[in-house]
């Protein structure tokens, strides 16, 4: 699909200066394609429809046929299986390192794909990210999507070419947070 986003994991970061501007390049990263799966949700008692965007994860690497032809079937499809695992089962047990790593990858994958999609649509409409905070509000209601803050900073600095202060100003004016677990009705009551 045309709106597929690329989410990058790992790799190395290279910095270079050009005409007084710092540029950041992520090299040798593992790239996972985020494929949008849009579901139309009809409003109650109205003719309006909203779109709920979900994401599927796919590998950018094809099955390694040289490994496959040598009988190493699982190794040949390893990249594909790992990419698909990101979106297959959410929130695995995190009482071991593998579960913690997968949860973090899932959180970053969904945040990055969604923010890249929002930024692309915004840039298509307005031609700039400088007014992002005037047209968008991103509400995070839990700790899982908190990665939206550093990812928006990355997009504004690395992709849109802003300096830190401008990117931080736009980010703080674009992101809102409500921690429901601190609200009174979610707290246990003391016993008499």
Residue ranges and their predicted role:
Residues 1-9, 14-17, 45, 60, ...:
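Conserved internal helical-beta-strand scaffold that buttresses enzyme catalytic cores
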Residues 46-137, 147:
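Function-dense linear segments that define catalytic or interfacial modules
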Residues 2-49:
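Extended, Lys/Arg-enriched charged tracts that mediate electrostatic binding to polyanionic substrates
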């Amino acid at each position: 699909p045309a709106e597929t986003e690329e989410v990058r994991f790992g790799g190395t970061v290279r910095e270079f200066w050009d005409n007084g501007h710092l540029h950041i390049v992520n090299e040798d990263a593992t790239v996972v394609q985020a494929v949008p799966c849009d579901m139309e949700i009809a409003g109650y008692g109205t003719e309006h429809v909203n779109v709920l965007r979900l994401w599927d994860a796919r590998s950018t690497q094809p099955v390694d046929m040289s490994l496959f032809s040598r009988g190493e079937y699982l190794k040949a499809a390893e990249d594909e299986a790992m990419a698909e695992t990101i979106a297959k089962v959410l929130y695995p047990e995190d009482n071991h390192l593998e579960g913690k790593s997968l949860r973090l990858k899932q959180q970053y994958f969904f945040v990055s794909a969604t923010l890249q999609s929002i930024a692309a649509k915004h840039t298509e409409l307005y031609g700039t990210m400088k007014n992002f905070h005037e047209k968008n509000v991103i509400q995070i209601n839990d700790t899982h999507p908190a990665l939206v803050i550093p990812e928006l900073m990355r997009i504004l600095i690395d992709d849109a070419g802003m300096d830190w202060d401008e990117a931080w100003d736009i980010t703080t004016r674009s992101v809102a947070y409500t921690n429901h677990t601190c609200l009174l009705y979610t707290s246990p009551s003391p016993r008499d």
